[in-house]
């Protein structure tokens, strides 16, 4: 892992530094990569997740006037049940969702907290097809992380939790309706989508829709399972480097994943 700072130089080679995301009409059958953010594109368990969890618990204590143990129970229970604590809090309690997201994703020194793989920009840039970020985090935080990692411009769009809601309710991964609507808006087929994600529950739910699934385990905390390959996972990788086209194994993985997206 390496620390990114504002003064760090991008690890894109010169031709890729000039590269811009194409806005032309998408090619039918091109892979559509859906990258999770936390613990996928960077190591959130190192410092960011502990701070978010602490802030969430404190917010619940203050807003609902409950003890810490009850606040932790609500946070964990709603995350497991709905995919994001925000959904449970807004459905069952008088919580302002925007204030909650702002409060729990504010950091005194985000660059110092970030850890990411070396060569991340090169890995993402050389993958074939279209690339999106699909995260249950708020947009401001997601874009701040991507900017610090020098990879924001490599993604066609950042789909954050604010974009997942409809007129009636907030939604988040692993909601099926949200993913269908998201891909339809992107003019992308479900069969072309490949989700790269650390949360097995999200992969399991979305595999039912027929998308490709990549389970990344290298950033997961020690108490979570990281071995084996469940039936709903097409590929298990420890590092995004496993998808590098410059290596034989990476070419094989990408070939198997993208072969399924052909018309």
PLM regions and their residue ranges:
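Asp-based, Mg2+/Mn2+-dependent phosphohydrolase catalytic module
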Residues: 2-30, 125, 138-139, 143-263
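N-terminal helical cap/lid subdomain that shapes the substrate entry/recognition surface
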Residues: 11, 16, 26-35, 40-119, ...
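Conserved residues at beta->alpha junctions
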Residues: 39, 133-136, 197
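Hydrophobic residues in well-ordered beta-strands that form the structural core
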Residues: 43, 133-135, 215
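Short glycine/serine/threonine/alanine-rich loop segments
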Residues: 66, 95, 129, 188, ...
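Short, surface-exposed loop/turn motifs that are enriched in glycine and acidic residues
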Residues: 110, 131-132, 168-172
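Catalytic-core regions built around general acid/base machinery
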Residues: 119-128
């Amino acid at each position: 892992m390496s620390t990114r700072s504002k003064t760090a130089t991008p690890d894109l080679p010169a031709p890729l530094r000039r590269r811009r995301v194409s806005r032309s009409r998408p090619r039918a059958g091109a892979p559509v990569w859906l990258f999770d953010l936390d613990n996928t594109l960077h190591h959130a368990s190192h410092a960011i997740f502990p701070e978010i969890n602490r802030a969430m618990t404190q917010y619940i204590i203050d807003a609902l006037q409950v003890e810490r143990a009850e606040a932790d129970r609500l946070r964990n229970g709603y995350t497991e049940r709905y995919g994001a604590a925000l959904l449970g809090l807004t459905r069952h309690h008088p919580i302002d969702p925007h204030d909650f997201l702002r409060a729990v994703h504010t950091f005194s020194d985000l660059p110092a907290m970030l850890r990411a793989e070396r060569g991340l920009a090169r890995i993402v840039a050389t993958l074939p097809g279209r690339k999106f970020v699909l995260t249950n985090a708020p947009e401001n935080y997601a874009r701040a992380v991507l900017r610090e990692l020098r990879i924001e411009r490599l993604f066609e769009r950042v789909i954050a939790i604010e974009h997942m809601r409809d007129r009636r309710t907030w939604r988040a991964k692993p909601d099926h309706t949200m993913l269908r609507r998201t891909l339809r808006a992107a003019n992308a087929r479900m069969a072309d989508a490949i989700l790269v994600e650390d949360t097995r529950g999200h992969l399991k739910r979305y595999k039912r829709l027929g998308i490709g699934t990549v389970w990344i385990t290298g950033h997961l905390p020690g108490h979570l399972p990281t071995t084996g390959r469940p039936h709903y996972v097409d590929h298990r990788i420890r590092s995004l480097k496993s998808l590098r086209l410059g290596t034989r194994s990476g070419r094989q993985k990408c070939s198997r994943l993208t072969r399924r997206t052909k018309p």
